[in-house]
Amino acid sequence: MGWFDRERMDSPLRAMIERKASIAVASVAGCLLAPALLAAIWMAVKPVLQSSPWADLWQDPRTFDALTATLWTSIAASLLAWCSAAYLLRQAFIGGQSGRWLNRLPPLLATPHAAMAIAVTLWIAPTGWLFRLSSPWLTGFDSPPPWATTQDTWGLGLILVLWLKELPFLCWVAATQLHRDDVRRRWHAEYAVALTMGRSPQSAFAEVVWPQLARLMRWPLVAVLAYNMTVVDVALIIGPTAPPTLAVLAWEWLRDADLALNHQGVAAAWLLAALLIAISAVLWVTVTRVVTSFTNRQAIGLGWVTLFLVYALAWLALLVGSVSGLWPFPDVWPDHWQANDWLRVTDNLDSVWTTVGLGTLSATLTLLWLVAWLECAPQNWQAVMRPILLAPMVLPPLLWVFGLYQVALWGHWEGAWPGMVVAHAVMAMPYALLALESVYKASDRRLQSVALSLGRHPMTYLLVVKWPLLKRALWSAWAIAFAVSVAQFLPTLYIGAGRFVTVTTEAVAQSAAGQRGLMSAYALLQTVLPLLVFAIAVMMGRPRHFTKDQTWT
């Protein structure tokens, strides 16, 4: 009897074996990841079970001011991104151009936060382009003004960077929902009914489409708020310094040789987590109503063009900054151009290869694990595991990094490639899951029934039918995981134990040193590497074209 014989395929024994094999694969996948994540959480909990870290935290004179700066910058940036996303999505939906704009988001997503922070610094610094373009004819300045336009006390520069970076992310999450056939048809039908009842396009979107879309985007909003409250590298580049944000303060305490200060830093991270839960609970209930009112207003239709123009200007600033030589104020362009900083980068190519290696390995590990889990795990297992998988996205990275560092010490993976790859994969997992999960689960199960009825083995169906049809989503998830890996700062510092240098750690270090050319070059590399990977993903994810004579086997 042949391997693909239909009677054998339909036998209860074979079905039972295949079901048990799938559960075994899911069990292995779950057992590989869940203990590591839970152990990391436990390692981060242990230091704060005593009262002394909390007492030290509240007695520190910088805590309250740092907490105030954190709440102001994070909430302001999150609400700005949320309202802007609502406006842009309304504009794209009403104009029938959602696919046109949303498909162009990958270059914006590929720009790391640190690179955007450096680009904004090059624009708004006292010696930046903004003052050069307006001096002296408008401002009257013949020399840079003595103003703290970056790292200002109010954190306005930090708010601007976080707003610009989180806006494309929220739009991309919405795109994953708008591109689902079932949702798109239903929402367009309901929108058309609202129009026939005399509603304006703005009112129809605000009252019919947006409330449903917003409910699906509340977890991504929590992720945005969590990142904004706990970001370290961006705050080091452009955030306030007197006081710094609480995340930066906690990072400084965790780096100290004093164990008591380490525990104080962990307590600060848990304080951020508690505040995140409280603020998220309020936003969960109120933000949809607030923005529904906002989306019901008339507005100028230049939002998407403005967003892409801002990113183009950011990339231009990085490019010019990386090749600029002597540049006296208020000249708009440098006196001469040079490539010395790029030559110094080429002398340190190890940082580039380390970044590429970590990104490739961690993205591949992430994708393999997710596919195995989504394909083999029962639905009730996935429902239980999903909050754990999304936890790295919504909990402070400082907690994860501290916990993973303790796990790495226990497993002797500190400063080693396996520990680095696993740490980067853990941080990339939730973003890749968001990109892949809905599309993977929405695949047409009738195709599997047809394949099995033709006597094909389930693995043949996966290799020849399902995965090729999903290759765009699979490559996109892999590219997103790669981009997340490139942007990692804290895991590289802690798990790498200072032995791994990436373009991100170099960009942050050079920005602290005030090296305009070097920080621009590394920030540009931060952007170019994910862009190249997204381009590869687009090319590899193109649909196949068959001729009449081609068949699948």
Report each predicted region and the residues it spans.
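Glycine-rich helix-loop "coupling/hinge" segments at transmembrane-helix boundaries
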Residues: 232-260, 330-332, 489-516, 550
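Juxtamembrane helix-boundary/capping and inter-helix hinge elements in multi-pass membrane proteins
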Residues: 95-98, 179-188, 199-202, 241-243, ...
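Short cytosolic juxtamembrane segments of multi-pass membrane proteins
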Residues: 3, 288-297, 498, 541-553
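Membrane-water interface segments at the C-terminal ends of transmembrane alpha-helices
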Residues: 17-49, 59-178, 212, 216-233, ...
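Short helix-to-coil transition segments within interhelical loops
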Residues: 182-213, 449-470
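Membrane-interfacial, low-structure loops and terminal tails that flank and connect transmembrane helices
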Residues: 8-9, 13-14, 194-199, 291-297
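Short, membrane-interfacial amphipathic segments enriched in basic
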Residues: 50-57, 329-339
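Short, Lys/Arg-rich, polar N-terminal cytosolic tail immediately upstream
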Residues: 1-19
